[in-house]
Amino acid sequence: MKRLLLCLLLLVSASGARAESMVVIVRHAEKTSGESDDPPLSDAGRARAETLSRMLRDSEISAIFTTEFKRTKETAAPTAIALKITPTVVRATEIATLADKLRELHGNALVVAHGNTIPDLIKTLGIDVPLNIPENDYDHFLIVAVGSQPRLLRWRYP
């Protein structure tokens, strides 16, 4: 799976103009159900976060961005620990701020966000394609080549 991810990153970077950075964007993993406005990850969510970490171990991620919510921080945590990166927290409502940070970045990044904010982030990064992430869908794995000609690669992960 790691080799496939590396091939996908190379494919996106090789097509068209050279990208300044590759941004992996995922929705937070499965959360617990309940009445909390800020629920933690469920057991399935923690397992998915570990899978994400294994997938990104050799991807040369140099920055990680999460929102202020537990579920995004917990999804990013295994990757952050494995890569020894302190995640940057950006408020979920500050899509333009996050997009600016990603455009300024010279390296690969992981963004863990929310199903209702990812479509706006993709659009703000220059990708104008319809994207809908249903409430019960946690397996979208998006790679955006950020540069003069932004490109999007959609994938699903276990």
Region spans (language model):
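Sec-dependent N-terminal signal peptides
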Residues: 4-13
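Single-residue recognition of alpha-helix boundary sites
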Residues: 13-14, 39
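Sec/Tat signal peptide C-region and signal peptidase I cleavage site
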Residues: 15-19
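Active-site-proximal alpha-helix that buttresses catalytic centers in soluble enzyme cores
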Residues: 20-106, 118-132, 136-158
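Short SAM/SAH-binding signature in class I
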Residues: 108-110
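Short beta-strand segments
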Residues: 112-114
